[in-house]
Swiss-Prot record:
The keyword Oxidoreductase is assigned to this record: yes
Keyword Secreted carried by entry: no
Chief place where the protein resides: cytoplasm
Family: Belongs to the class-I pyridine nucleotide-disulfide oxidoreductase family.
Protein's recorded name: Soluble pyridine nucleotide transhydrogenase
Purpose: Conversion of NADPH, generated by peripheral catabolic pathways, to NADH, which can enter the respiratory chain for energy generation.
Protein's gene: sthA
One BP term from GO: pyruvate metabolic process
Cofactor: FAD
Organism per entry: Pseudomonas aeruginosa (strain ATCC 15692 / DSM 22644 / CIP 104116 / JCM 14847 / LMG 12228 / 1C / PRS 101 / PAO1)
Regulation: Strongly activated by NADPH and 2'-AMP and inhibited by NADP(+). Ca(2+) increases the activation and decreases the inhibition effect.
GO CC aspect terms: cytosol
Entry-linked Pfam families: Pyr_redox_2, Pyr_redox_dim
C-alpha cells in the first residue's frame, strides 16, 4: 500500500474543493485533491450548474429564433430534440475540464482518483478504480464532496422513465409531456427549459407558492411566465406513489389526483455526499440529509477537518461554495482571505432569469422597517427593446429616511448580471450605501444597468 504525506488533502474538485486548493497552494502548502472522477470539476461541471445552464442558453436561442419575425425570412420555426440541444452542453463541459485541469497543474497540486474514506483524523484511504488502495496522511483536510439528488426509497429510479436532476442529462428522447416533482430552484429551471422545447410540463409544488424565499412580486412574475409557456403548476400537492409504465409514468398524489406523462423528473431536495467518507471513524455526525455542521470558520467538530460547499447545506450555490472553500483554506493557512459567506446573491436560471440580494418586502414589513420601492420595467428600457427582451423589471428597496439600499430584486434578461451593481453598493460602508449613487452616476447608454438609475428616480419620486 502506497502512503503519501501532505500538508492539506481536499476531498472533491467542485467549486468548494477548487477554491480551497487554489487558496492553500498560494501559501506554499503541499496539497493533494481526491475525486471519484478521472476529471476535475465535480458535479457542478459534469451534472449540475454548467450543463444545465448551457442547456438553458441553447433553449433560449431556439426561443429567440422561433419568436423573432426577422428570422422568418430564413425559415419557419424549428424545434430541436433534447439530445441535440444537450450536445452544446457537452462542448462547454470539455472546455471547463481543460481549464480547471490547468489550474491544478500550474499550482503543482497532486491529484488522486478514487473513493476516499477516513481511517483516522490524519489519514484517508483512497480506493482507486482499479481496486488499488492508497493512503494519504495530512495535517488538515477539507471535505468538499458536494451533494446529489435526494431519492426516496419508495420510488424506482431504475425505471427508464423516472429521472432525477443528474440522470435527466442522459435523456435520449424529447418527451411530449413531463412531470416535474418539486418546484424548488432546480425544478423551476427545468420547467423553463423543457417548456421552451415545446414540452407540456406539470410542475408539482409541495408548497403554496413558487420559491417562497423570493420577493412576492418576483415569485408571482415567475408563476405567470411559466403558465404563459404552458406549464401547469399544482400547489400544495404531495406524492403517494409513482407507477411506472412501459411507455410512461403515472404520478398518484395524496389529494387523489392522477397525472400521466411520458417521463417523471424528480427535483425534491438534495443529500450531502457523506455516506462513504467513513466519518464515523473520526466522530463527525451528519444530519438527516447527510450534511455536515460547521462553525463560522468552516471547521467541523474535529479541529483539523473542515467542510465547505453543498456538503454543509445552505445556500448550496456554486458561487458560495467556491468562497466557502477559499475561506476554509484561509483558516488553515491563517491568512486574511477568510470570511464567513452569508450575503450571497441568488441566481435562478429560469427563462427569464431571476436574481436578488438583501431583504424582500415581506421581511422588511415584518421587521417594521420604513422602506420605499423604486422600479424600472424593462419594456421601457432602450437596451431591452433593442435585444427584444422586454419582459422583467428591476426593483430596489431602500430606507425612506437614510436612503440605504436594503434589497435588490431583478426578473428578466441578464438579471444575474445586473444584480451585482446593487450588491457592490450595498456592501459599501455607512453613508456610501445610498440610493443617491444611482442618480449621481452616469451609466452607459443603452444598457440594462441603466435600469438602476430609472428605478432610483422612481423611488425618490415616491418620497414626501
Amino acid at each position: 500500500m502506497a502512503v503519501y504525506n501532505y500538508d492539506v488533502v481536499i476531498l472533491g474538485t467542485g467549486p468548494a474543493g477548487e477554491g480551497a486548493a487554489m487558496n492553500a497552494s498560494k501559501y506554499g502548502r503541499k496539497l493533494a485533491v481526491v475525486d471519484s472522477r478521472r476529471v476535475v470539476g465535480g458535479n457542478c461541471t459534469h451534472l449540475g450548474t454548467i450543463p444545465s445552464k448551457a442547456l438553458r442558453h441553447s433553449v433560449k436561442q431556439i426561443i429567440e429564433f422561433n419568436t423573432n419575425p426577422m428570422f422568418r425570412q430564413i425559415g419557419e420555426p424549428r424545434w430541436f430534440s433534447f439530445p441535440d440541444v444537450l450536445k452544446s452542453a457537452d462542448r462547454v463541459i470539455s472546455k471547463q475540464v481543460a481549464s480547471r485541469t490547468g489550474y491544478y497543474a500550474r499550482n503543482r497540486i497532486d491529484m488522486f482518483t478514487g473513493t476516499a474514506s477516513f481511517v483516522d483524523e490524519r489519514t484517508v484511504e483512497v480506493v482507486t478504480p482499479s481496486g488499488a488502495v492508497e493512503r494519504l496522511v495530512a495535517d488538515q483536510f477539507v471535505i468538499a464532496t458536494g451533494s446529489r439528488p435526494y431519492r426516496p426509497s419508495d420510488i424506482n429510479f431504475n425505471h427508464p422513465r423516472v429521472y432525477d436532476s443528474d440522470t435527466i442529462l442522459s435523456l435520449s428522447h424529447t418527451p411530449r409531456r413531463l412531470i416535474i416533482y418539486g418546484a424548488g430552484v432546480i425544478g423551476c429551471e427545468y420547467a423553463s427549459i423543457f417548456s421552451g422545447l415545446g414540452v407540456l410540463v406539470d410542475l408539482i409544488d409541495t408548497r403554496d407558492q413558487l420559491l417562497s424565499f423570493l420577493d412576492d412580486e418576483i415569485s408571482d412574475a415567475l408563476s405567470y411566465h411559466l403558465r404563459n409557456n404552458n406549464v401547469l403548476i399544482r400547489h400544495n400537492e404531495e406524492y403517494e406513489r409513482v407507477e411506472g409504465l412501459d411507455n410512461g409514468v403515472i404520478l398518484h398524489l395524496k389529494s387523489g389526483k392522477k397525472i400521466k406523462a411520458d417521463a417523471l423528473l424528480w427535483c425534491n431536495g438534495r443529500t450531502g455526499n457523506t455516506d462513504k467518507l467513513g466519518l464515523e471513524n473520526v466522530g463527525i455526525k451528519v444530519n438527516s440529509r447527510g450534511q455536515i455542521e460547521v462553525d463560522e470558520n468552516y471547521r467541523t467538530s474535529v479541529s483539523n477537518i473542515f467542510a465547505a460547499g453543498d456538503v454543509i447545506g445552505w445556500p448550496s450555490l456554486a458561487s458560495a461554495a467556491y468562497d466557502q472553500g477559499r475561506s476554509a483554506a484561509g483558516n488553515i493557512v491563517e491568512s486574511d482571505s477568510w470570511r464567513f459567506v452569508n450575503d450571497v446573491p441568488t441566481g435562478i436560471y429560469t427563462i427569464p432569469e431571476i436574481s436578488s440580494i438583501g431583504k424582500n418586502e415581506s421581511e422588511l414589513t415584518a421587521a417594521k422597517i420604513p422602506y420605499e420601492v423604486g422600479k424600472a420595467f424593462f419594456k421601457g428600457m432602450a437596451r431591452a427593446q433593442i435585444s427584444n427582451e422586454p419582459v422583467g423589471m428591476l426593483k430596489i428597496l431602500f430606507h425612506r429616511e437614510t436612503l440605504e439600499i436594503l434589497g435588490v430584486h431583478c426578473f428578466g434578461d441578464q438579471a444575474s448580471e445586473i444584480v451585482h451593481i446593487g450588491q457592490a453598493i450595498m456592501n459599501q460602508p455607512g453613508e456610501l450605501n445610498t440610493l443617491k449613487y444611482f442618480v449621481n452616476t452616469t451609466f452607459n447608454y443603452p444598457t440594462m444597468a441603466e435600469a438602476y438609475r430609472v428605478a432610483a428616480f422612481d423611488g425618490l419620486n415616491r418620497l414626501f
